[in-house]
């Protein structure tokens, strides 16, 4: 069974384009995880503190409803409204499924930050060009197995591997305009 999952993940990674631009269509997954934040309300404006106009620290996130059998969690923060295609702001893999939150500005022990669209293994706060508000998706994925990702994996490759292995997800959306 594990070899089959590895094959599915490999196929997803191979089929995905590299780089931080457009991503393919998302896999249809059950939305059983609830993601919230004390930093901003669902659908609300993300305070400047968490953006390139402020301290650019990651916001606090909390979640519930992680399915039984989850081995690890992965977090992806992206902007589907970016002019050049979806921009990936943050990828965090190997989150302990027993954990129920990320503190503001924190990455817990054992978790791994992967490259964002700027090529940095770090949180990159919202920083849209002037104009209408962009939507920032904070998506948490439940994974039944540990997904091994190369430290130098392109964001699209890492996300494809996570989405292919995931059994469920949850999403919080915030907005920001400059």
Protein language model annotation of sequence segments:
Residues 2-6, 12-178:
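N-terminus-centered regions that define maturation/targeting leaders and the start
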